[in-house]
């Protein structure tokens, strides 16, 4: 702790200079240590923070055992803050309430009577209205505390004594978990199943060198038992992989994905509704429903029609789908993605090792320290019992002497002024023996029987020999600890109502990401409009006539096409880059839209080449002005960031010029020199990124247009007058050749623009 500096006497004439940096460091260190050691972090041995330990100890002092009657929480809080914990009454009451909540504690330590809050987040009633007593769990934590099982220390005012740690016969740290934020560190431990913890502890006693994997449940060997994973008081489905959980337990850091438990209820005639019966740990039901309702109003859940809370004592949240055709799995996956119906519970096993050193511990280390503590408690209780037996044997020895000399003893007591000293001298008694004889009632003295004394003496002597043998043998001590753990395991077995596992395990379904994303977007028709200068907007509905569209001065239409708000829009630039925008993310049709460069990181020297709706099954041919090109799968050019994805490598003055869908088995290429070359598409390589290969050779100029077609159907083009021309396979013989050829002059009737469409 920091140095206590009292203000010096003498006023301004007696000022002591203090280095500010050193003084701040000293006081902050004192504060940090106080927070870590006496407030925020639990002890690995009993799993309790000081405030919880003091509450349980105070209730024990008040006699609030599981079989006793309840007492007002106001009385408990008063004793705690008055004798042990000099802090605010509300903070102590909040801690007491949490110990009693069956949705906060996997194994409640306090049995509460009255309103102790609920899973909706409502507060408990004031402590003048509620009552409490300890549960069996608290009794186990205290077991042996009156038998010198643990050390005691003075309280804050040195008027009472409090335990530094509880005996902890129950594996409370892992069974009930813990959370807290200290200075520069924090702890977060989820609750576990006591039956499984006892299995792991028993295995660790037999195999002290067991690894974390040895303590975990193995589906291939279910008979061995072990820890499956967290077991939350609110249930839920854990969808974390076993490998990930093992790594978390090995390092002491990680997390667990937990989902709500849900089922589909058939309403007949094809109708159904989804019912959520369990929600993730530490999620407030009222806030969860409020969040889903907000998303519903914001039209972020187009598959959901309504949500109702039909909960009574049990959780029952009803989700009404938009229609009978809605896929329940996709609806739930979208809710898991957007709401706390799926939560990640962190694991950070940062605890006070042996009550002194804060450190992050692995699962086997936590259990090992708890077992070491239980062994120490066993030794201390055994020594305490041994001392009590020795005292009793000494007294019984005195009783036996008194019995054999009963008449003389009575005479000494009646006639001597100092009977104690006389008996010690006459019979060779110890001070304790003489005092015990003198303290006996006359009735008891007359009823002394040698047989009863010798029977008790022999019984205690036998017990003493057993305890001495126990203290002399490490193996016997571990056997005794294992027996105690076995009794706890029976009491909280999975066959019992409290002990049965509540959280189950499942693999997260391989959901269609595209389907989930679309499920979160209201599907509406739009028309995407991009101008020559790169302004983009989305008009509501499908608009065929774009002649009435308004643009800024000097700007005009570059490309427009129909789409849906659920579509992905691919934008290809002259720099060979592809960008992806969601149809629902495009600016509205009012005004001129927004510049593309605000939405994506598009270089200033690049322009929009084309844009279209993404089709993951489609392939494209991309070509540069110089006549290089290749085939790319459309799904390979989807970009997930603002930076886009470089598809075609071009160097100025060369730039990307054409992006054409693959629709056949041959490719027709027309150059600016009005020469056409036709060759099989298989000669063009397929790649995700590159410069490509030469499609057509030119002396001057570059490529003008490309068309992919099926040779069996022939090559078709349209002139400026709208007339359609088709050349069959036989008619194309003179233009057919191999890739990178020069080609021949285009056929008669080919458009003067050098394009396949007028």
Curated annotation (Swiss-Prot):
GO biological process: chromosome segregation; DNA topological change
Active site: 129 (o-(5'-phospho-dna)-tyrosine intermediate)
Enzyme Commission number(s) from the entry: 5.6.2.2
Entries under Gene3D superfamilies matching the protein: 3.30.1360.40, DNA gyrase/topoisomerase IV, subunit A, C-terminal, Topoisomerase II, domain 5, Topoisomerase, domain 3
One Pfam short name: DNA_gyraseA_C
Alphabetically ordered keywords of this record: Cell membrane, DNA-binding, Isomerase, Membrane, Topoisomerase
Top enzyme category: isomerase
Similarity comment: family membership: Belongs to the type II topoisomerase GyrA/ParC subunit family. ParC type 1 subfamily.
Protein name in UniProt: DNA topoisomerase 4 subunit A
């Amino acid at each position: 702790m920091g140095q206590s500096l009292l203000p010096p006497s003498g006023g301004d004439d007696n000022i002591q200079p203090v280095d500010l940096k050193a003084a701040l460091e000293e006081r902050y260190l004192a504060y940090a240590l106080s927070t870590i050691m006496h407030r925020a972090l639990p002890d690995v041995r009993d799993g309790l923070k000081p405030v919880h330990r003091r509450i349980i100890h105070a209730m024990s002092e008040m006699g609030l055992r599981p079989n006793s009657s309840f007492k007002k929480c106001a009385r408990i809080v008063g004793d705690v803050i008055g004798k042990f914990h000099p802090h605010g009454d509300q903070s102590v009451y909040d801690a007491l309430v949490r110990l009693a909540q069956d949705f906060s504690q996997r194994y409640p330590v306090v049995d509460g009577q009255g309103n102790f809050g609920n899973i909706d987040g409502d507060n408990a009633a004031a402590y003048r209205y509620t009552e409490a007593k300890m549960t069996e769990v608290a009794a186990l934590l205290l077991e042996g505390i009156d038998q010198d099982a643990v050390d005691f220390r003075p309280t804050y005012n040195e008027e009472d004594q409090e335990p530094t740690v509880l005996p902890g016969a129950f594996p409370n740290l892992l069974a009930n978990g813990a959370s807290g934020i200290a200075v520069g560190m924090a702890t977060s431990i989820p609750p576990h199943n006591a039956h499984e913890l006892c299995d792991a502890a028993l295995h660790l006693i037999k195999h002290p060198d067991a690894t974390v994997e040895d303590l975990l449940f193995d589906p291939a060997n279910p008979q061995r038992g072990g820890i499956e994973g967290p077991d939350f008081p609110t249930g839920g489905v854990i969808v974390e992989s076993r490998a990930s959980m093992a790594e978390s337990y090995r390092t002491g850091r990680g997390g667990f994905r937990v989902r709500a438990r849900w089922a589909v209820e058939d309403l007949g005639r094809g109708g159904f509704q989804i019912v959520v019966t369990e929600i993730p740990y530490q999620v407030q039901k009222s806030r969860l429903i409020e969040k889903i309702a907000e998303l519903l109003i914001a039209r972020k859940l187009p598959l959901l029609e309504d949500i109702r809370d039909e909960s009574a004592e049990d959780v029952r949240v009803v989700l009404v789908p938009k229609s009978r055709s809605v896929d329940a799995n996709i609806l739930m996956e979208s809710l898991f993605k957007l709401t706390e119906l799926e939560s990640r519970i962190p694991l950070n096993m940062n605890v006070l090792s042996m009550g002194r050193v804060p450190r992050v511990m692995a699962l086997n280390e936590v259990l090992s320290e708890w077992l070491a503590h239980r062994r120490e408690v066993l030794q201390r209780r055994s020594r305490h019992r041994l001392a009590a037996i020795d005292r009793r044997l000494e007294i019984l020895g005195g009783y036996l002497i008194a019995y054999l000399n009963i008449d003389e003893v009575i005479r000494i007591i009646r006639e001597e002024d100092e009977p104690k000293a006389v008996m010690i001298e006459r019979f060779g008694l110890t001070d304790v023996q003489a005092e015990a004889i003198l303290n006996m009632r006359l009735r008891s003295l007359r009823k002394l029987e040698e047989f009863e004394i010798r029977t008790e003496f022999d019984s205690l002597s036998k017990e003493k020999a057993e305890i001495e043998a126990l203290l002399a043998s490490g193996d016997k001590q571990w056997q005794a600890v294992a027996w105690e753990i076995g009794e706890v395991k029976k009491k909280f077995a999975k066959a019992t109502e409290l002990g049965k596992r509540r959280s189950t395990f499942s693999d997260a379904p391989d959901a269609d990401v595209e389907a989930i994303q679309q499920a979160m977007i209201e599907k509406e028709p739009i028309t995407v409009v991009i101008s020559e200068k790169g302004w983009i907007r989305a008009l509501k509905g499908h608009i065929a006539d774009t002649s009435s569209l308004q643009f800024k001065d000097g700007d005009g239409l570059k490309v427009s096409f129909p789409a849906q708000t659920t579509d992905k829009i691919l934008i290809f630039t002259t720099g060979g880059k592809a960008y992806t925008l969601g149809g629902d993310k495009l600016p509205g049709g009012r005004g001129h839209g927004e510049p593309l460069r605000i939405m994506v990181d598009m270089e200033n020297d690049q322009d929009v080449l084309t844009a279209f709706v993404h089709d993951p099954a489609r392939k494209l041919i991309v070509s540069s002005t110089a006549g290089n090109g290749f085939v790319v799968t459309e799904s390979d050019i989807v970009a997930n960031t603002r930076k886009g994805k470089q598809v075609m490598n071009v160097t100025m003055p060369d730039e990307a010029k054409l992006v054409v869908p693959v629709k056949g088995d041959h490719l027709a290429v027309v150059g600016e020199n009005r020469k056409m070359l036709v060759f099989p598409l298989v000669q063009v390589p397929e790649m995700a990124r590159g410069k490509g290969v030469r499609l057509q050779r030119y002396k001057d100029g570059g490529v003008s247009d490309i068309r992919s077609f099926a040779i069996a159907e022939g090559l078709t083009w349209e002139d400026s007058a709208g007339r359609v021309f088709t050349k069959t396979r036989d008619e194309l013989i003179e233009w057919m050749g191999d890739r990178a050829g020069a080609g021949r002059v285009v056929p008669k009737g080919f458009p003067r623009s050098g394009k396949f469409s007028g």
